């Protein structure tokens, strides 16, 4: 009898896993197919110089081939992966374009898988407990949330309707998914893993023997952060800034009693610091008689693209703001959610107050860090909303949860339409 019960349990578990894996695999396959097509068109059209499917893919392809692109890309992960794939595709017509598109797609889709794993790890058990009659549903919910997050965008009105002070749909507002920038997309699997690993270490690193008990987590965090930096440093600058201020604040608050644990966690940043010094050496060297280095401003660069910053913020992170207002107590309970907002604030401050001097000023390169801040604000909000969905055991709670999902859906509908424009070759801004 016991063997029969155990056998039925195994069959149910296998069925649950089969349904969950099949649905998630189908979602990732569809997302991979459409994003690969976009990346491939960007590669082809950029090499042809048609002006359609605007991107920096031509420079990336030249960098991958070891040719002079006219730019400096001291972050090699995407280019090395594409070069490895090119060993196979070189004999094909358009093999270089195919290799770069495949590399970008693989890393972007890998980020979807990484996010799904993290959502399951941090909220999966709570969802399973709330849905005992449908054991396959929590996995489908986290999988759908993970994939859909890679298609959300800023909120924007229909064509022909203009909002006060908003000059562009994208520029000045910004999106968590800038489909025209391959290095941003490629860095996200490592950024996601580094973000969650740091969030997991925050509650424990000050404890006695934390290094000994969580040595593997320290090492993994250092590796993830270095890989993210070597793919695109924009996320790293934000995380390092937010983490540095947070760790210093904790150290001062404890009157340096946690000095040694803080140093041990700080050691994880050393490989990344060394790589950042290598990458940013060119920023501080004036070129062609122009001023170099990092300057301080008061939103001057941002103001070139937007005249209504409060509205732009609302359009970019309306969903995370709503989740925060309705679940503000989670800031005290959840270190990962709290750090998602600390990261967003740091990304905003950097974009508002800092800029690269000289010819790089108009590029507004600190906006890439801001977009990572937006992305992880969405990640944190999704974590909280999935948890709230599991706890929605009354009519009032279900209504509140539904309102938050509707806000997310609004960003998603705008994002899908924004992505559709990319597929048609439209400009990103």
How should these model regions be labeled?
Residues 1-41, 126-144:
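Start-transfer (signal-anchor) and selected internal transmembrane alpha helices
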Residues 59-102:
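Short hydrophobic/aromatic helix or loop-helix immediately within or flanking a transmembrane segment
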Residues 102-132, 147, 193:
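Transmembrane-helix motifs of polytopic, lipid-linked glycan transferases
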Residues 269-276, 281-429:
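Transmembrane helical bundles and short interhelical boundary loops of multi-pass, membrane-embedded
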Residues 217-233, 239:
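Membrane-interface alpha helices of multi-pass inner-membrane proteins
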Residues 24-72, 87, 359-360, 425-429:
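Extracytoplasmic loop-helix module adjacent to an early transmembrane segment
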Residues 137-202, 308-312, 364-374:
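Membrane-interface micro-motifs in multi-pass membrane enzymes
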Residues 239-269:
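Perimembrane helix-loop-helix junctions
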């Amino acid at each position: 009898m016991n063997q029969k019960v155990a056998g039925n349990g195994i069959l149910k578990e296998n069925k649950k896993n089969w349904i969950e894996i099949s649905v998630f695999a189908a979602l990732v396959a569809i997302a991979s197919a459409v994003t690969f097509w976009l990346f491939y068109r960007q590669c082809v059209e950029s090499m042809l110089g048609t002006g359609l499917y605007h991107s920096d893919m031509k420079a990336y392809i030249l960098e991958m081939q070891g040719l002079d692109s006219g730019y400096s890309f001291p972050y090699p992960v995407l280019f090395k992966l594409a070069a490895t794939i090119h060993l196979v595709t070189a004999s094909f017509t358009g093999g270089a374009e195919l290799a770069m598109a495949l590399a970008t797609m693989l890393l972007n889709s890998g980020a979807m898988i990484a996010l799904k794993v993290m959502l399951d790890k941090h909220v999966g058990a709570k969802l399973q407990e709330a849905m005992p009659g449908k054991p396959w549903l929590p996995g489908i919910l986290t999988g759908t949330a993970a994939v859909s997050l890679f298609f959300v965008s800023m909120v924007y009105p229909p064509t022909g309707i203009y909002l006060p002070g908003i000059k562009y749909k994208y520029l000045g507002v910004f999106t968590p998914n800038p489909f025209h920038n391959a290095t941003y997309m490629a860095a996200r699997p490592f950024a996601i893993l580094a973000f969650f690993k740091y969030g997991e270490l925050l509650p424990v690193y000050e404890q006695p023997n934390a290094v000994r008990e969580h040595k593997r987590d320290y090492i993994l965090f250092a590796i993830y952060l270095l890989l993210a930096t070597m793919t695109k440093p924009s996320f790293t600058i934000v995380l390092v800034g937010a983490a540095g201020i947070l760790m210093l604040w904790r150290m001062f608050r404890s009157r340096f009693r946690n000095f040694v644990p803080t140093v041990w966690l700080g050691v994880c940043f050393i490989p990344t610091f060394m790589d950042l010094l290598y990458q940013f050496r060119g920023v501080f060297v004036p070129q062609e008689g122009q001023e170099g280095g990092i300057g301080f401003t008061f939103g001057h660069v941002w103001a070139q693209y937007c005249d209504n910053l409060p509205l732009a913020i609302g359009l970019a992170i309306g969903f995370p703001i709503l989740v925060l207002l309705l679940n503000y107590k989670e800031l005290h309970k959840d270190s990962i959610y709290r750090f998602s907002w600390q990261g967003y604030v740091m990304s905003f401050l950097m974009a508002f107050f800092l800029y690269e001097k000289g010819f790089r000023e108009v590029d507004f390169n600190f906006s890439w860090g801001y977009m990572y801040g937006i992305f992880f604000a969405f990640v944190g909000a999704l974590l909280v909303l999935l948890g709230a969905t599991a706890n929605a055991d009354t009519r009032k709670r279900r209504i509140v949860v539904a309102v938050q999902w509707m806000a997310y859906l609004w960003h998603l509908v705008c994002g899908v339409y924004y992505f559709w424009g990319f597929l048609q070759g439209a400009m990103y801004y």
